[in-house]
């Protein structure tokens, strides 16, 4: 277990971000190419070299497919090149765990993964999906490495930290949102995020940026003790 320290010169030690919503117009993230470019330029100024953007895939709300995502990625990368922004852009996806996703897994649908076959998943915030363990097992059986997005935000995990330990024991990687260290989402999310850092249970940090307003909050988050503490962990961001 790590001890909390005081940092006199807070900095952004990350060069790779693994969670954002920067492909315009396909989910609840940025709405225009212009907004995407502004945010990406700011990421570059913060020292990022690579962004792995992860649009939502939720059947009844954001029915994105690998084809749709690939096309949007191609278009945005072309704009980045025009602006000469020195940053690499890749895309995965953020899959919502529900019966539709389970069906896709059973049908062998190709997924949007990143890095060494990592797949980012999310759940509803209130209750643990009854088939979450089945989804995790199926993904792992298919050769994917499961990454749970922002576990600190789920109420069912805030109420039972043992559930988080169980997820780790099952081979799930945990991705914490930097904004959680500021209390942006809730006090309970901040508390769990700090617990996960304290107990060295975090594998990835992500920005989960949806818009310029959140980017401003992110700049404050990198100064938080929780974020700086995470810099002492063996995070997998830099390996991507």
Regions found by a protein language model. Give the residues of each.
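Non-catalytic positions within long, well-ordered alpha-helices that form the structural scaffold/packing
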Residues: 44, 140, 197-198
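An N-terminally biased module of ancient metal coordination in phosphate/nucleic-acid-related enzymes
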Residues: 1-85
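Extended substrate/RNA-proximal surfaces in nucleic-acid metabolism proteins
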Residues: 2, 63-173
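Active-site environment of divalent metal-dependent phosphoester hydrolases
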Residues: 58-61, 96-98, 153-157, 181-184, ...
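Mid-to-C-terminal alpha-helical segments outside catalytic/metal-binding sites
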Residues: 2-4, 219-240
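His/Asp/Glu-enriched short active-site or ligand-binding loop at hydrolase and phosphoryl-transfer sites
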Residues: 171-183
């Amino acid at each position: 277990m790590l001890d909390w320290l005081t940092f006199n010169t807070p900095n952004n030690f990350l060069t790779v971000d693994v969670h954002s919503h920067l492909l315009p117009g396909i989910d609840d993230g940025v709405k225009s190419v212009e907004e995407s470019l502004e945010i990406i330029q700011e990421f570059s100024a913060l020292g990022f070299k690579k962004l792995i953007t992860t649009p939502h895939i939720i059947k009844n709300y954001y029915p994105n497919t690998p084809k749709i995502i690939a096309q949007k990625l191609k278009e945005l990368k072309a704009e980045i090149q025009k602006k000469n922004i020195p940053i690499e852009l890749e895309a995965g996806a953020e899959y919502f765990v529900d019966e539709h996703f389970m069906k896709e897994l059973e049908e062998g649908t190709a997924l949007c993964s990143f890095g060494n076959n990592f797949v980012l998943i999310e759940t509803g915030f209130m209750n643990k999906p009854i088939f979450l363990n089945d989804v995790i097992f199926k993904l792992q059986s298919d050769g994917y490495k499961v990454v749970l997005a922002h576990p600190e935000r789920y109420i069912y995990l805030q109420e039972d930290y043992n559930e988080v330990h169980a997820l780790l024991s099952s081979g799930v990687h945990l991705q914490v949102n930097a904004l959680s260290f500021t209390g942006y989402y809730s006090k309970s999310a901040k508390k769990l995020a700090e617990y996960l850092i304290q107990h060295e249970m975090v594998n990835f940090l992500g920005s989960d940026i949806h818009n310029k307003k959140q980017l401003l909050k992110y700049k404050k988050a990198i100064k938080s003790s929780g974020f700086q503490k995470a810099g002492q962990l063996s995070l997998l961001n830099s390996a991507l």
